Amino acid sequence: MGRRMVFPKSTPLSMSSRRRPGFTLIELLTAIAIIGVLAAALFPAIGGIRKRARQSSAQTAFSQWASALARYKQTYGFYPNIGSTYSTTTDTLHDLGDAAVNGRFVRALSGRQPTGSALSVADRRALNRNAEEFVAFGRDDFEDPANFSDASRLVDRFGNRRIRVIFDTDNNTSIRNINPPGGAASLPGELGNMATAAGLPARIIIYTTDLGDDFESFDGLGASDFAQVFAIQ
């Protein structure tokens, strides 16, 4: 007799073994909701980190400018006369929100125009007779870098053009009785005493603020887009 071939019986796949693993609609919606909650919590934190980084960068720039002003005084014996008058009996606040003052500040400290061209004879005589470079301004120090020109204005890293520069022009190592354009309430808390007779020990102060509507940008930003930045020398 011939041998019989025996084949194993095939077992039909169960419905459960053919089903692919996956998420139900409820599980997907739950995951999306969790991601949304996490994103809502993270975005403000990320925004805060970025703002603090810009604040730090702005403070570094202001500190460099203040050091440049100190070197200017060491070189010439006085602070740059960037305003309409120069008083030696009181301390002096200069508003770089004024385009003319802003321009004189740049030319006095850099020894040139914003674009790098040479100072006129009149500017050298009035602002920096040796055309010495006390600080090198970069394009990121000015507003609207895409349209950079000799008329461009310095701003802080938030685009605030209302930069206040204060000199101890009475040479008593204290800045006092300052009347800020935005009022005393606009001052960062650490600078409050400079608006009083008690004063603040300093020779140079540079600051911007987000208080008292004492801020301005060429693109019309609001208070939440600015920050308090200052440097004391």
Language-model-detected regions and their locations in the chain:
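Small/flexible residues
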Residues: M5-V6, P21-G22, R52, A126, ...
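N-terminal pilin/flagellin-like segments and related low-complexity appendage regions
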Residues: Q55-Q233
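N-terminal leader/signal peptides at the extreme start of proteins
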Residues: M1-F23
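N-terminal single-pass transmembrane signal-anchor helix
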Residues: R19-I49, R54, A58
